[in-house]
């Protein structure tokens, strides 16, 4: 799907609407992180709670915004807590296609209004993942992941 260079994350996600129409749910992830998340367990969790969206919650180094949770209910977001106390958006989602209705167009950022509306509307749950998760936002992180792959010790390679 050609989303165009200037399209924000929400607009990119909205472009898959025709492909997921009629489905009960679909999976979405960002392209800048790797994990050994059990996708089947995440889908099962999503189906069990009956909400529109599930986000994976992970504990990273303390350089990301954090999810505020009451149990598994996402109630808000905290920008970059110190240390690694908070759970963050791990970037792996299970979504009901109706989530796409919350996206206005190409200038919508998925992480802003759509996710906030899902959280405040009690339609977002967090699946806590305690295994391997690593972003690739810096050269250092890219090198770390490439070294893991080259060594044969890539925890995300589950096939």
Which sequence ranges carry the predicted segments?
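Extracellular glycan-interaction surfaces
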Residues: 56
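Active-site and channel-lining beta-strand-loop segments
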Residues: 66-69
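Short phosphate-binding loop-to-helix
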Residues: 1-27
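Generic hydrophobic alpha-helical segments
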Residues: 12-16, 42, 50
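Catalytic-core segments of class I nucleotidyltransferases/pyrophosphorylases
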Residues: 24-29, 34-35, 39-47, 59-62, ...
């Amino acid at each position: 799907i050609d989303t165009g260079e200037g399209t924000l994350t929400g607009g990119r996600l909205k472009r898959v609407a025709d492909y997921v129409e009629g489905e009960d749910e679909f999976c979405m992830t960002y392209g800048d992180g790797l994990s050994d998340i059990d996708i089947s367990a995440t889908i099962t969790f999503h189906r069990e709670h009956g909400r529109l969206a599930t986000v994976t919650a992970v504990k990273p180094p303390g350089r990301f915004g954090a999810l505020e949770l009451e149990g598994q209910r996402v109630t808000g977001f905290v920008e970059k807590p110190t240390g690694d106390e908070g759970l963050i958006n791990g970037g792996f989602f299970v979504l009901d296609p109706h989530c796409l209705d919350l996206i206005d167009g190409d200038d919508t950022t998925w992480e802003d209004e759509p996710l906030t509306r899902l959280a405040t509307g009690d339609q977002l749950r967090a699946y806590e993942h305690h295994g391997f998760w690593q972003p690739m936002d810096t050269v250092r992180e890219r090198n770390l992941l490439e070294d893991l792959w080259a060594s044969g010790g890539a925890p995300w390679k589950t096939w």
